[in-house]
Swiss-Prot record:
Covalent link location (Isoglutamyl cysteine thioester (Cys-Gln)): C5-Q8
PROSITE patterns: ALPHA_2_MACROGLOBULIN
Species for this entry: Octopus vulgaris
Disulphide-bonded residues: none
InterPro entries: MacrogloblnA2_CS (IPR019742)
CC terms in the record's Gene Ontology section: extracellular region
Protein name: Alpha-2-macroglobulin homolog
Lineage top rank: taxon: Eukaryota
Function according to Swiss-Prot or TrEMBL: Is able to inhibit all four classes of proteinases by a unique 'trapping' mechanism. This protein has a peptide stretch, called the 'bait region' which contains specific cleavage sites for different proteinases. When a proteinase cleaves the bait region, a conformational change is induced in the protein which traps the proteinase. The entrapped enzyme remains active against low molecular weight substrates (activity against high molecular weight substrates is greatly reduced).
Organism ancestry: Eukaryota, Metazoa, Spiralia, Lophotrochozoa, Mollusca
Amino acid sequence: KPSGCGEQNMINFYPNVL
């Protein structure tokens, strides 16, 4: 699974999407 995309989205707030 892509790390940062779905993992801990509450904490990272989608760093890869932003």
